[in-house]
Amino acid sequence: MSNSAIFKVRLKRTRKNKNLTQEQLAEAVGLGVRTIGRYEQGSSFPNERVLHELAEVLKVKTDWLSAKN
């Protein structure tokens, strides 16, 4: 499985485990809901800054979320 495929699964699963909606996550990191949706669908991948913010809000390590481990 590619890093982007792992990322989309981990992002969605972690967001749901934290009981956050796409809207809540988007607001917390200053993105649009559509952007979060594209990340979770695997049609887009965040830049390093956004990846770090997502990991911080979700309380996970950036490397784990991005599947760089």
Question: What residue spans do the PLM features occupy?
Answer:
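Short, charged recognition helix plus adjacent turn
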Residues: M1-S2, E56, S66-N69
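A short, Lys/Arg-rich alpha-helix, primarily the initiator
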Residues: M1-N17
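DNA major-groove recognition helix of helix-turn-helix/homeodomain DNA-binding modules
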Residues: N47-W64
